[in-house]
């Protein structure tokens, strides 16, 4: 299938029931890119000889040097199912050729924003788990995101070669390892999923259904229970069964698959399956999975790796494996690779699992539409998305920008959800801040070219129908990172993606040569486009700040900035951590502020949130868009708020969505609604720049108790009320025991038992604490989980490696915000140092402003 012309691809694109959009997700170094190679090599875009070494989807030079995936890349594959295999597909189909759009995404947690962007445009996910180290923290994070986006998972147990050759597990232990991983994954799915009654039905993975693959990406072999069930159905078949039609055959194979997993046993003497572990004569029976599936694999491994030539030759003949002449002379690992590749090719097993079990756009968009589209569920756009209708109006989501070879220009990368996108089509380009009916963040422009993304290559194509993934040229000037492209006039936006990590580490950058400043600014603009997560901010003091998810993320952003985007030498400051400001108890006095003309008074108090509410707002469980009464009920039940107060939430802040709340608990105040907008504006301003050191506030609830206003409207305009509201809010915070919050990482460290002591030493020096330690069953590895302040995490990896002889591998994920102990007003405490440093860096007056500046006397 090498001669893939664009016309051939275009023809399959119309068969939307035969398209699969899927991403490959996993923990770092569990072998995603290597597995992707087997798929690409099977579907024919790399020469098969080079598969396994090419890592085709790692397109950047630094990715190949560091052996990690940094950006997600897209490739289209084509796979044909045989008549027999088509019978397994439970959804609608259209012919036997399948177009698979595969996105390989990074596993490293600092790039999880790339993963989010990849998930948005796909409907299914291949979750790769290293069967030696099991389900890790990043697997869980990514899987949780996938389920939140309603993406159906299938599982692949990778690195079986390690389990056999390094750990020398016996079949029963290996079965238990697999069983445990399947259980762990299902626990995550059932915790975050919607259950069987949800719109997707049951999405738990189960080897019996064929949604779990086993194998080794590096050696290029893999199987699901389906492959073995087919072998045994053929073997046990009676003579008359040879003429079975595909549907009957599929039914037989499915019955066989049920017998190959779980507590089912096989009696080799009689050739019968049984449900009890002991045979009729009382001897222990082997488990079917071990006897019928693992045993042949173990035999092949054993014969070849211990150089038993005759036995190996016999096995190869018995399993009916045809080797090339050049492979026959090999021995040891190379021969093992060749044999296993021939017998259980990874490409076939995985591509069959993908085509049979992952949903097509037709199936998936029915239940994903309500999550994807912000507008009413019955307008033209929503119906087009639900039905995946190529004749509907165009709705397309751009999930990220991909840099082109031409410096400074980007392809917009995204997926068509309804309609048809074509070269030269005039479209509405809507940024994330667009609201229907307004002009801002909206551009009417033609699309210059539509292109196909092929890993390292780009192919121009005339037009692309819905259900497909595509790149656009000429849209990049109008969008920053993401956006919606449509031809329907009253369309709403596609929902903005939620990132699982937040940018908490920031560095200031400046050009070494001041004359290069314009280039730096231009470079920052491009950097903000090319990475979905990074934030580029210009401080009021004129500093240029880059905020990222962690050290590695920032390092790569800075490298990109220096080499690709700005192309100038750059000086950078030490990394700085963002803090949040909060309060720890209720204001001890009622705070009053008067407006500049002394005619209006505001009375307010502040108090801290109950535990968990700020996190609920971050997750979107409680939000400004919710229906009023429903939100009030939730707050009353879960957090014991007063229902009438909960109904009178004026707004959330900063930015209208943040984790602070302004409630109105006044009784019978005249003209209150006229100043509502002004007070809200003051609140947004105050929560964005807190009183301690102008950082965002978090977890503060402000109550408006009473307002006295001037009767004449001209004396209570915005100019009078906004600064007053801000002063009053600051006074509330200062009287309510203000505190600083710092971000905390969850660190997961894998290491051998003997170096655990060294880890504790490093963590204690860095204010970290261990909250869980467990042994990975069946291996000598320990997993230590700890909380570590982000502030202390710089150089943590290097420190850890030097203290454990390089045997510990940490993974840091942003987990939560925690109050920094100590009072910022006490000059000896840690928070007061942080406040002083931050104020100095931002060029503010020294010392926290005194309460008298904000609090007025009656």
From Swiss-Prot:
GO cellular component: cytoplasm; cytosol; nucleus; ribonucleoprotein complex
One GO MF term: GTPase activity
Domain tr-type G: 17-362
Protein name per UniProt: Elongation factor 2
Pfam families: EFG_C, EFG_III, EFG_IV, GTP_EFTU, GTP_EFTU_D2
Primary site of residence: cytoplasm
UniProt record similarity statement: Belongs to the TRAFAC class translation factor GTPase superfamily. Classic translation factor GTPase family. EF-G/EF-2 subfamily.
Broadest EC class assigned to this enzyme: hydrolase
Protein's cellular compartments: Cytoplasm; Nucleus
Subunit annotation: Binds to 80S ribosomes. Actively translating ribosomes show mutually exclusive binding of eIF5a (EIF5A or EIF5A2) and EEF2/eEF2. Interacts with SERBP1; interaction sequesters EEF2/eEF2 at the A-site of the ribosome, thereby blocking the interaction sites of the mRNA-tRNA complex, promoting ribosome stabilization and hibernation. Interacts with HABP4; interaction takes place at the A-site of hibernating ribosomes and promotes ribosome stabilization.
Entry keyword Protein biosynthesis: yes
Keyword annotations from UniProtKB, A to Z: Cytoplasm, Elongation factor, GTP-binding, Hydrolase, Nucleotide-binding, Nucleus, Phosphoprotein, Protein biosynthesis
GO biological process, one term: translational elongation
Residues modified as Diphthamide: 715
